[in-house]
Structures are given as structure tokens and as C-alpha cells.
Amino acid sequence: RKVIGVEIVEEAVEAAKENAALNGLDNCEFIAGDVLKVIDDIEEKPDYIILDPPRDGIHPKALEKIIRYGVDRMIYISCKPTSLARDLEVLTARGYQVERMCCVDMFPWSGNIETVCMLSKKD
């Protein structure tokens, strides 16, 4: 098994590499770049996808490419409910269903929440 992480912030990629090394993980590859541009270079079909896009959600072209992988399950983490709703509308129209959803208060005493959705491919 292999973990591939794509992150636009270079410092976050370096931190992920350092964290993987500190934990003795040698099956991780972290790529710095925009997922829309990098996704075409990832030829292996993932078993599972975890999405944590910026506030505006996933670029529609990137979302289409992610859907084409046809994974059975994915996690979508969102910090903006309207972006999540827009992307979930596309995902559900393309054969995914929301299995579970919960809100996580990552920023106490603020008006912000993270929403975590577990999606699965409809049979």
C-alpha cells in the first residue's frame, strides 16, 4: 500500500515528509502542487481518497478527475458548508452517497467548524 498526498503549500509538504520519516513510514509520497495540475500525473487508482480542499472547494475539473478514479469510499473535509454542498451535489449525482457526516469544532470560540463526510459508491 502507498500513500500519496498532494498539497499546494510547500511548507506543509515538507512537514508531511518530515512527519512520515519520524514515524518510520516509507510508503508515503508527498507532492507540492495544485491538485488540478498534479492529478494527471497520478496513474495508480487509489483505494481510498481523502479530500481537504481550500474554502472554495474542489475545482470542478479536479472533482471530475477524482470521480473518474471510481473509488468505493472517500472522506471529504470542508471548512465552508456552501462549498461542501456544491461538491456533494456533484458527487451524489455521479453515484456517491453520504454515509456519515459530523461537524468538528477545530477553532473553539470562533464561528467556524469543519465538516467531515464519509462517502461511498452506490451499488
Across the structure, where does each feature detected by a protein language model lie?
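Rossmann-like S-adenosyl-L-methionine
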Residues: 1-123
